Amino acid sequence: MFEVSAIVFAVSQAAEEGKSSNFLLPNGTFFFVLAIFLVVLGVIGTFVVPPILKVLQERDAMVAKTDADSKMSAAQFAAAQADYEAAMKEARVQSSFLRDNARVDGRKSIEEARVRAEQHVVSTLQIAGEQIKRERDAVELDLRAKAGAMSLILASRILGVDITASVVTR
């Protein structure tokens, strides 16, 4: 029952206070709480917000700088890529030119070697022909010189008479 009497006492006291106060007119507690709020707001605005804003501004500046560096790096990369592509294109053209020149030089070298080989063959054949002609002429002279004597020996063998002495005396 103690609980019920405490509740009744609290309700009656609240009713008495409610009759004397007007909710449209603020009382002293409101002004005290408002003053504390304004002091806390001033302290936070003076000591907490400026360092946070400074850090945020520095962060924004770093982000902007990083973005600018990124754009500059992308532009440099694109320029380097273009230079690389141009250099590669030029190198391909130059290598193609050098390869074609090497092929032409190789064909010229092969043709020159073929001409030299043909000249060597012709000169070798000419030298061999001249040598064979000289040997043939020498053999022919030798055979002509010996042909008379051989025919006499052959005739004397066939006839059985020595013809060598009579031909030589004539």
Swiss-Prot record:
**Main localization category:** membrane
What one GO molecular function would you report for this record?
A: proton-transporting ATPase activity, rotational mechanism
Disulfides per UniProt? none
**Where in or outside the cell?**
Cell membrane
One short Pfam name that applies is: ATP-synt_B
Provide this UniProt record's keywords sorted from A to Z. ATP synthesis, Cell membrane, CF(0), Hydrogen ion transport, Ion transport, Membrane, Transmembrane, Transmembrane helix, Transport
Query: What topology does it adopt in the membrane?
Result: Single-pass membrane protein
InterPro entries given in the database record: ATP_synth_B-like_membr_sf, ATP_synth_b/b'su_bac/chlpt, ATP_synthase_B_chain
Transmembrane region positions? 30-50
Which Gene Ontology terms of cellular component type are present? plasma membrane; proton-transporting ATP synthase complex
NCBIfam families, per database record: PRK05759.1-3
Quaternary context: F-type ATPases have 2 components, F(1) - the catalytic core - and F(0) - the membrane proton channel. F(1) has five subunits: alpha(3), beta(3), gamma(1), delta(1), epsilon(1). F(0) has three main subunits: a(1), b(2) and c(10-14). The alpha and beta chains form an alternating ring which encloses part of the gamma chain. F(1) is attached to F(0) by a central stalk formed by the gamma and epsilon chains, while a peripheral stalk is formed by the delta and b chains.
Q: What does this protein do?
A: F(1)F(0) ATP synthase produces ATP from ADP in the presence of a proton or sodium gradient. F-type ATPases consist of two structural domains, F(1) containing the extramembraneous catalytic core and F(0) containing the membrane proton channel, linked together by a central stalk and a peripheral stalk. During catalysis, ATP synthesis in the catalytic domain of F(1) is coupled via a rotary mechanism of the central stalk subunits to proton translocation.
Family, as annotated: Belongs to the ATPase B chain family.
Entry protein name: ATP synthase subunit b
User: What would be the name of the gene that encodes this protein?
Assistant: atpF
